[in-house]
Regions:
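Membrane-embedded alpha-helical segments in integral membrane proteins
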Residues: 45-60, 74, 103, 158-159
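Membrane-helix boundary connector in multi-pass membrane proteins
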Residues: 111-122, 126-142
Length: 165
């Protein structure tokens, strides 16, 4: 079991290690995690999705639906951020239109039927694969497959949770 940083003999130690050594070991651990993400982005997406689904078990339906819609809006905005970083007008237009479309689906989920929200997540997974294959927005190569799997697992899991309520 890891212990937090504690004062010991006038200096800080972490599990008996000096601060510099502890910092190096922590950086190496983070580096290994990041390397795993780039080698296995689909597994990372599935894992992140499975980590984010349990909150919908404890949230009441009146909160779960808007929360999922807000996260969908944030997810859609990530690609707009990549487009802004990219700087090309055509990419910004494509990403901007897509973000507006996903925001519209999130709002439709709030206004008419919550089932628009998991459907939008599933469609966003398709959009992710289009990025991976067709759209040349500047972004990390691991991001589209990670996000696609996240979206599909989350859409399926959210649908299952809402059906079982």
């Amino acid at each position: 079991m890891r212990r937090p940083w504690t004062p010991s003999a006038g200096r800080f130690t972490f599990e008996g290690r000096a601060p510099a050594r502890a910092a190096v070991q922590e950086a190496q651990m983070i580096s290994r995690l990041a390397a795993g993400l780039t080698r296995h982005p689909a597994m990372a997406g599935a894992g992140l999705s499975l980590l984010s689904l349990p909150i919908h078990l404890v949230l009441p339906e009146a909160v779960s639906i808007p929360f999922a819609a807000v996260i969908l809006g944030l997810v859609a905005g990530i690609y707009a951020g990549f487009a802004l970083q990219d700087g090309r007008a055509n990419i910004l237009a494509i990403e901007g239109l897509a973000a507006v479309a996903f925001l519209a689906l999130a709002l439709a989920g709030l206004a008419w039927s919550p089932w628009f929200i998991p459907a939008a997540y599933a469609l966003h997974g398709v959009w992710d694969l289009l990025h991976h294959r067709r759209i040349s927005t500047a972004m990390p190569s691991w991001y589209p497959p990670m996000c696609a799997v996240y979206d599909w697992v989350f859409a399926a899991g959210l649908s299952a949770l809402w059906i079982l309520r």
